[in-house]
Amino acid sequence: MYSFELDKLKIELKTWEHDFIDKNKREPTRDDIKSLRTVRQMYKQYSTLKKKQSLQRQKVDTQESVELPAHKKDHDEVVEIGPTPQVYGKAISIFDMNLSPIKPIYMTFTNNIDVNNDNSKTISNESSPRKTILLKSSPADRTLVAEPISSVKRQLNFQMLNASSTRTPTSSPCKNRNGKLVEIKKCSPTINPPLESGKPSGYYGPNSPLKLDEENIHLNISLNSSTKRRLQIAYPSLQKTPSKDQADISTSFSPSPLIRRPLTKSLIELAREHTEIVKEFGVLQEEDIEEEEEGEEGENGYDEKNHEDDFGLEDELIRPKVVKDIFQEDDDNDDSQAREDTFIRKRPKRRKVIRRLRDNDPETETAGFERDVHKELVKLKRRKVAEFLGSTSQISDTEFEHDPEASSGVVSSEQKPTAKRKGRKKYNLVSNNFRRLKLPKKNRFSNGRWGRR
């Protein structure tokens, strides 16, 4: 309502202020506004409208903040319980589940007695309230009364121990046979508990230390168990020589909080493992010696060159791996030193090589000289031409002078340059891929764009 007039006045005042600044090059003051009557009235009108608008907004805010009273409906509504957790038709979150459900208390009234009379009311709080309702009264005479909601959380009450609130109790409360706490008596380790021979195990609390005496719990360790060896190490007085019957007892055990067992193996177990390792190494050494003897017998049929290669390996000698028994006496050390002095020849792996058979006959070796066919043909042509012209002596002499190798007709293999073998290239070039995969090149068509296909 007032917003339109306020906006209009604000525009007029701003236009006058800007005109005054452009004209006088300064902002208008109060004296300038008071001197002009029309401008002064516009400012007064603007201030009054502004106050009215603020008062109107405050009234609207107060009306919105007033809460309407909730009117309870007289008739009951049909409530459909959905899958969400609810208590009597009202949805609750999972964080409100610590509240126990409301326990109904059914009240029945006797016939022909006033409902308002308290003496005529009887409360049935039994485990099955529905049965009592059907037997005692009709639905018209029954009313439902709800108890206040109680929390599930329990609180410990140590007032029965007659201890101060600032002091923590040092003993657990006793219980009678029915499970109720005894307020007068205390259960302390120094005083004998009031326990008879036929009392149940629930007489004390679950964490009471006196429960051990009641149940007669003792720790018995049998000497035939798997922990005997651990105990002998921990207590030297229990150490005895192990018998043959107990030699094969399993050493597996479960961790116990009462007995500290060493995690390492015992000396007897280490000695057994050592003897087994010594036996295995002895068998392996015997097998190696047998294989070497068989190899020496087979090497007798080889040629002299192979024998020279074998004799060249005598420098590569190794000492045998001799496992020393730490449990043997010092008398056996001489035998072990004698074994260490022995040498075993290391036989390397050989590769089968097929060699060409060599013949030492000098006649067959000299007969294999190579001849140049082209030079032989040139020499024959020159002879035929010389015979036809009749000057065989002159041509043959000049031929022998300029070409002494052609006169003999033999080309020495030593003077002929041997073709160098091209080594394998380190990198595969891109051009090799073009040649191998038959890829098109840049200048593949000499005659125009399209060539022969």
UniProtKB/Swiss-Prot annotation:
Effect noted on mutating S208A: Normal interaction with DPB11
UniProt keywords, alphabetically: Cell cycle, DNA replication, Nucleus, Phosphoprotein
InterPro entries reported in the protein's UniProt record: DNA_rep_checkpnt_protein, Sld2
Effect in UniProt of substituting T84A: No interaction with DPB11
PTMs per UniProt: Phosphorylated by CDC28 at the onset of S-phase. This phosphorylation, specifically phosphorylation of Thr-84 promotes interaction with DPB11 leading to DNA replication. Dephosphorylated by CDC14.
Bias-annotated ranges (Acidic residues): 285-301
Phosphothreonine sites (modified residues): T84
A Gene Ontology biological process term: double-strand break repair via break-induced replication
Effect of T241A: Reduced interaction with DPB11
Role summary: Has a role in the initiation of DNA replication. Required at S-phase checkpoint. Also required for the proper activation of RAD53 in response to DNA damage and replication blocks.
Subunit structure: Interacts with DPB11.
PANTHER family (UniProt xref): DNA REPLICATION REGULATOR SLD2
Note: Present with 656 molecules/cell in log phase SD medium.
Protein name per UniProt: DNA replication regulator SLD2
Originating species: Saccharomyces cerevisiae (strain ATCC 204508 / S288c)
